[in-house]
Amino acid sequence: MGASDIGEMTSGRDWQARYPELCARAKGTNVNDRTLLATDYLNHVNEIIMLLELVPDAPECLEDCRAWRPMSYTEHFEASSIADRDLAIEAYEFSPPEFRGTFDRLIREMHRVIAGALAGLEAATAQGDEERARRVVELAVRALKTMVDHASSTIHGDAQVMDQAEIDGLMDMM
């Protein structure tokens, strides 16, 4: 990907000057010094995974699931208290497109899976269908954990990414 493509993704900022500076600042922090992404964001998704897993045996946890809201990467870190939150927010804009593009796509798909799971749980609960609720949770959690693993790999700079066909396959299971 060329510098002009990267420049477009970073709102026209001087990526070539800022990227090396941010990589240097990221060393020894919670922000990956190559991808400029931080795994702490995945805690937000892991929270809803944990809540979803509780619902079949503790239906009252559905209320907690309803209260959960998707957050963008920046929103998550703005609400975070981790020491490197300001760096995480600043560096995100300069994450190379081969990482950030994949990461952002995975996050969008995770949010879509979560919305579908919540809708499925609502319907199953309204009908008193515990078996269907378990199946919805099982499929959603499996898909979400796979996507979280891929997002984590992306954050750590693994070039192997989940292609759209793999994501669609997970979605078809739901």
Regions found by a protein language model. Name each.
Residues 26-47, 54, 60-68, 88-109, ...:
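Non-transmembrane, amphipathic alpha-helical segments
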Residues 2-26, 74-78, 82:
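Acidic, low-complexity proline/glycine-rich segments
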Residues 141-174:
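Glycine-rich, aromatic-bearing surface loops/beta-hairpins
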Residues 78-92:
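Charged/polar, low-hydrophobicity segments characteristic of intrinsically disordered regions
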